[in-house]
Amino acid sequence: MIQVLNLGHVDYTTAQQLQTTLVDLRKRGVIQDTLLLLEHSPVITMGRNAKQKNIVASQEILAQRGVELIECDRGGDVTFHGPGQLVGYPIFDLRSLNPKIGVIEYVRRIEEVLIRSCGDLGIPTTRVEGLTGVWTVNEPQAKIAAIGVHISRAVTSHGFALNVTTDLDYFKLIVPCGISDKPVTSMQHELGKSLTLEEVMPVITRNFGFIFKEQVLWLESLNDLLPTPEDLPARAPETLRRLHEDDLHLG
């Protein structure tokens, strides 16, 4: 079973804190495999292999554009998250899958989910040998989705970022994923029309169920995932507790 939760708009730091909590709960068997779907405010993230030279813009320009700069523990180099981009964070225990899989197969499966989803929505995409992510088929090949993961004791965090209606000018602030010879694109650019994240989410979710051979269950709120505040760590960040309390109040 894969539980799916649409968190809407969440800042990157809060999402990191939530992932840390959920990874701990998944390791302890408190929750099942969970897929978080969300959208971030403008932020450049630096993965474990990030090179400072791949941030082209100065701190002043980033501040003017309202773009945060945050280091994180995912794999990969530098990437951008922001409005119009569908971000997915699977919190999966790879040992619970049948058969169990390793990190390379896990990343290949996420790529396949994205390739199938883009195809379902009218955009032919593929892999590029030697590179991670999903790319358009037509020349010049452009990256439409980035993938960067972290795995701790077989439990995954971080995940993918699919450009739906993302403002591609933001990617001029960096060398995306350290790849200078291939452009970045979006679903809107490829289709010549706009899609909402809410239109894309069910397609992504359906393909997660198909590729990982699991049933999918949509949750209404974080309250359904964390039934009581006691499930949060004793010293959970205030932003995370507030996010949970907001869901409780909505209920």
Curated annotation (Swiss-Prot):
Main localization (coarse): cytoplasm
UniProtKB keywords: Acyltransferase, Cytoplasm, Transferase
Pfam families the record matches: LplA-B_cat (PF21948)
Localization in the cell: Cytoplasm
CDD domains reported in the protein's UniProt record: LipB
GO cellular component, one term: cytoplasm
Location of the BPL/LPL catalytic domain: 29-216
Principal EC category: transferase
EC numbers, comma separated: 2.3.1.181
An individual GO BP term: protein modification process
GO MF annotation list: lipoyl(octanoyl) transferase activity
Family note: Belongs to the LipB family.
Function: Catalyzes the transfer of endogenously produced octanoic acid from octanoyl-acyl-carrier-protein onto the lipoyl domains of lipoate-dependent enzymes. Lipoyl-ACP can also act as a substrate although octanoyl-ACP is likely to be the physiological substrate.
Protein name in the entry: Octanoyltransferase
Organism: Koribacter versatilis (strain Ellin345)
Protein encoded by which gene: lipB
